[in-house]
Each structure stands twice: as C-alpha cells, then as structure tokens.
Amino acid sequence: MHKLEKGYRDLYTKNFKNLTELMKKLRGKDGCPWDKEQTHDTLKSCLIEEVYEVVDAVDSGNPENLQEELADLFFLIIFYCQISDDNNIFSLNNVMEACFEKMTRRHPHVFGGKSVENAVAVL
C-alpha cells in the first residue's frame, strides 16, 4: 500500500467518525432540541431542497458550491440513518452494506464474469 493511500484512508476514517459522532451528539441527551425532534417525515422538505441545491450547484459549474451542497446532502443522509438507528429500524452501517451489495450486483461487468463493449451495453 502506498503511504499516501494509508494517510488518506486514515483521514477518511477520522472524518467519517467525526461526522457520525457529531450527529449522535446533536440528537443525544444534551443535543440540539430541533435535531432531536426531527423524523423522516419532518426532514422531507429539507431533503428535497438540498437535492435541488445540488442540481443548481452542478448547473453553475462552481466546484466549491457543489462541495458545500453535497456536504449538506451527505449530512441529511447521516441524519436519516441516525433517526432510523435511534428507533431500532436500521443503521448507517446497514445502509452502507446495502449500497455496496446493490452496486456490485448492478455491475456484473466489473465484479462478475460479464463483459460489455461500451457504456450503452451496461444499461
């Protein structure tokens, strides 16, 4: 493994842990009253707004704005997962596992024995 790769992985792990711990604190006993009251349903309008803001950022061609809006959207995904975890429905880890399984299943040309000639053949 390249030294830079390990450092990047360590930083990624640290940042991910910091973000998930932040969300737990916001919804915890001494957390934010607004965050603690949120449900999947009450966050729907925020989710829709953030998706539109990501689309606008893509359209603007401004990478800094896109990064900011993706951060907001990513945080909402963490938020939804924490609400589910708090209610013993599923965890962030369950979502990540499901994502991994789904994407590997959808790409047999990469992770299986299937071969394709071009991008059109993938669809």
Residue ranges and their predicted role:
Residues 1-69, 75-123:
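Flexible "arm" and connector segments at domain edges
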